[in-house]
Regions:
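Acidic, polar-rich low-complexity tracts and alpha-helical solenoid repeat scaffolds
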Residues: 1-198
Length: 198
């Protein structure tokens, strides 16, 4: 908190404020965390602004309409455990979330977190399956284009399935034309297809 005050308009201060907001999120103080994150969305550091926006959206999209935060509390706990590299414990909590709240808007976020953990564990087949679940569950999800892009990257770089990667990049370009991943997907698609790039 002191760094946040001493370096209020500096990247270091913004990083400190983000870490504080993330800590509030981990503790379950979602409204306060979101208020802090909303301030950071206009941060000068693009990385901090993107991280703040991402976490703020996660909170706002998944706060219950009746203001219950039980599912979000579970997810935040799993997120904290993953942050602390206690991935097996995080997976247990994410499984609990799927069992207790099978129709909650956090289901796809939980699968995405599980996919990230599977990537760290180098279990690429399970990671691919989880991205597939996200896309089958809700192709209009806020994270659907992220899942599709990560799945394409996975096939290109780790599963060495260039044909599948090509198909997935094309799907992203066609189905999510407004995605931030379109430009990079188009480049990767052309490179995999063998086009001469400038």
């Amino acid at each position: 908190a002191q760094v946040d005050k001493d370096f209020k308009h500096d990247a270091l201060g913004q990083e400190a404020k983000f870490r504080g907001a993330r800590l509030d999120y981990f503790r379950g103080d979602f409204l306060w965390a979101q208020a802090q994150l909303d301030v950071l969305k206009s941060a000068t550091s693009q990385l901090i602004a993107n991280d703040a926006l991402s976490l703020s959206l996660l909170i706002s999209d998944n706060m219950g309409l009746d203001s219950t935060t039980d599912a979000l509390m579970l997810y935040a706990r799993a997120d904290l455990l993953s942050y602390r590299n206690k991935n097996d414990d995080a997976l247990v909590i994410l499984d609990s979330l799927h069992i207790l709240y099978p129709n909650h808007s956090l289901v796809d976020d939980a699968w995405y977190k599980e996919a990230q953990i599977m990537d760290m564990k180098r279990n690429y087949v399970a990671e691919d399956s989880l991205y597939g679940k996200i896309l089958a569950y809700d192709s209009a999800s806020v994270i659907a284009d992220d899942a599709l892009y990560q799945r394409a990257l996975l096939h290109e770089t780790k599963l060495n399935d260039k044909a599948k990667a090509l198909e997935l990049y094309q799907d992203l370009i066609v189905k999510y034309p407004g995605s931030v991943f379109v430009v990079e997907s188009r480049k990767k698609y052309r490179a995999l297809r063998g086009d001469v790039l400038n």
